[in-house]
Amino acid sequence: MSQILTTRQAEELHKSMVAYLSSLEASKSTAALREELVLPDTFDDATCKKYAGLLEKKFLTCSLKANPSKDNGLSALQILDLESKVAGLQAELSSLTLTSRSKGGQDPDNWLPGPASTRTFESHRDAITCIAFHPIFTSLASSSEDCTIKIWDWELGELERTLKGHIRAVTGLDFGGQKGNTLLASCSSDLTVKLWDPSKGYANIRTLSGHDHSVSAVRFLTSTENLLVSAGRDASIRIWDVSTGYCVKVLRSSDAWIRDISSSFDGKWLVAGGRDQAVTVWEVATAEQKSALLGHENYIECCVIAPPTSYEHLATLAGLKKPPAPSSSCEFIATGARDKTIRLWESRGRLIKTLVGHDNWVRDLVFHPNGKHLISVADDKTIRCWDLSQEGKLVKTIDNAHSHFVTCMRWGPSATTDVETTNGVTNKGTTKSKFQCVIATGSADSCVRVFS
């Protein structure tokens, strides 16, 4: 027995030696060494695989200690250690689900925001115009009429950085882009759309020019990697390829200011609403307008396409015998306007319900991921929760959510995974949602609040 190694260390070394020979497919040598070392019966082929590569790593570690790199001040051993830690963190991040990051003990499906915010962020010098959650990290972006964008850590309650580049009010934000390469898009009254790269310290990597007036809203097309949509006061909807910066399509139906846009979960449909009191429905592939929703009596401030989780409840409201298939997109739409109402529509143009309760302009809407609730904010300083399973009944009101108009709202990041059927085939139309119980609101009081 070696006097340097303990019994356990010697046994680990012997196992790694056998695993090394086994990986070389040297069966005779492996068998001979096994017999010579008298390894226990529990060291079977499956256990042997766990030791694969261990001997090489030990040799490399010793080699690096003897020959440190002097190129960048770090030894090669330190670099190896850092690479190992990075790999471990990446594995941990991959295994972390969105729901596991929510507070334990909550029932996400029935969660609604409470009367008190958990975080209040104050740094902007003018009204908040839009907010957006990073899809993976606990970063929250806010835009303001003070011409800046601020990035917050909404869990720690810290301001991470301030982005400057726009020269007039920043009016819209959205995170999106290729998987693993998330970008932040912003739009402004300075007629531009800007792209910021979080992986490069939120460097402004591209500016998209083409609008002839203030840009009001910007959205990444869901389920596409490179397409971004913007709309504005020049009455146009522009679709951009963010990888090239080129405008690939321009949609236009009237001369009215477009205030908001929304895309379907599969990126095939767009809806837009604005000053002409109409909501238009567009097919992205053909750039054709498919329908117009008419009924509001003042400017439309917000529009959102209903998720498939809401189809069951909205189909009942619409008097349908059965809900549309979950794989279909843009079946129902919710809109909010300066006429103080929220309207629920079939995408073909039929009004199915008008929700009345706000005392001022309705500024933003978001569907609860469970599909059962619709949440709204307005210039009456309230957050209101509507139960679609009870014919759109108002079930909760948070008064004085802010000290001034509540201008915008977003739900925290959600993820959906395809559900496998019993025969193992993936059903693209049936998804399982994982989401966090958190929403953020912005206000004309220059504050951002987080409810979680």
UniProtKB/Swiss-Prot annotation:
Gene Ontology process terms (BP): cell division; establishment of mitotic spindle orientation; microtubule sliding
Record key words, sorted: Cell cycle, Cell division, Coiled coil, Cytoplasm, Cytoskeleton, Microtubule, Mitosis, Repeat, Transport, WD repeat
GO molecular function, one term: dynein complex binding
Gene3D superfamilies: 1.20.960.30, YVTN repeat-like/Quinoprotein amine dehydrogenase
Coiled coil: 76-101
Pfam families, per the entry: LisH_PAC1, WD40
Subcellular location, principal: cytoplasm
Ranges for the WD repeats: 123-164, 166-206, 210-250, 253-292, 295-355, 357-396, 401-449
One GO CC term on file: cytoplasm
Location within or outside the cell: Cytoplasm, Cytoskeleton; Cytoplasm, Cytoskeleton, Spindle pole
Role played: Positively regulates the activity of the minus-end directed microtubule motor protein dynein. May enhance dynein-mediated microtubule sliding by targeting dynein to the microtubule plus end. Required for nuclear migration during vegetative growth as well as development. Required for retrograde early endosome (EE) transport from the hyphal tip. Required for localization of dynein to the mitotic spindle poles. Recruits additional proteins to the dynein complex at SPBs.
Entry's family note: Belongs to the WD repeat LIS1/nudF family.
Protein name: Nuclear distribution protein nudF 2
Organism in which the protein naturally occurs: Talaromyces marneffei (strain ATCC 18224 / CBS 334.59 / QM 7333)
Lineage: Eukaryota, Fungi, Dikarya, Ascomycota, Pezizomycotina
Gene: nudF-2
